[in-house]
Amino acid sequence: MGKVHGSLARAGKVRGQTPKVAKQDKKKKPRGRAHKRLQHNRRFVTAVVGFGKKRGPNSSEK
């Protein structure tokens, strides 16, 4: 058997410590064809073809 990192008595320690934050109301996301359209626009249409390092979809850099 492999070793366990730490005892199971400490399981869930961090999640238990973090303060509860209420979920916020958000706009509904488009479904089906409309969502595919959104994805296509995000990935291919508005993407600027430039030189340098490729940035991921979650990048906040401009």
From Swiss-Prot:
- Record's keyword terms, sorted: Ribonucleoprotein, Ribosomal protein
GO biological process terms, alphabetically, are:
translation
Q: Does the keyword Ribonucleoprotein belong to this entry?
A: yes
Cellular component terms, GO, for this chain's entry?
cytosolic small ribosomal subunit; mitochondrion; nucleolus; plasma membrane; plastid
Compositional bias of type Basic residues: which residue ranges? 25-38
Cited InterPro entries = Ribosomal_eS30 (IPR006846)
Region called Disordered, residue ranges: 1-38
Named from the GO MF annotations, one term is:
mRNA binding
* Record bears the keyword Protease: no
Q: Which family does it belong to?
A: Belongs to the eukaryotic ribosomal protein eS30 family.
PANTHER family on file: 40S RIBOSOMAL PROTEIN S30/UBIQUITIN-LIKE PROTEIN FUBI, SMALL RIBOSOMAL SUBUNIT PROTEIN ES30Z_ES30Y_ES30X
Q: What is this protein called?
A: Small ribosomal subunit protein eS30z/eS30y/eS30x
Q: Which organism is it from?
A: Arabidopsis thaliana
Lineage of the species this protein comes from: Eukaryota, Viridiplantae, Streptophyta, Embryophyta, Tracheophyta
Q: Name the gene that codes for it.
A: RPS30A
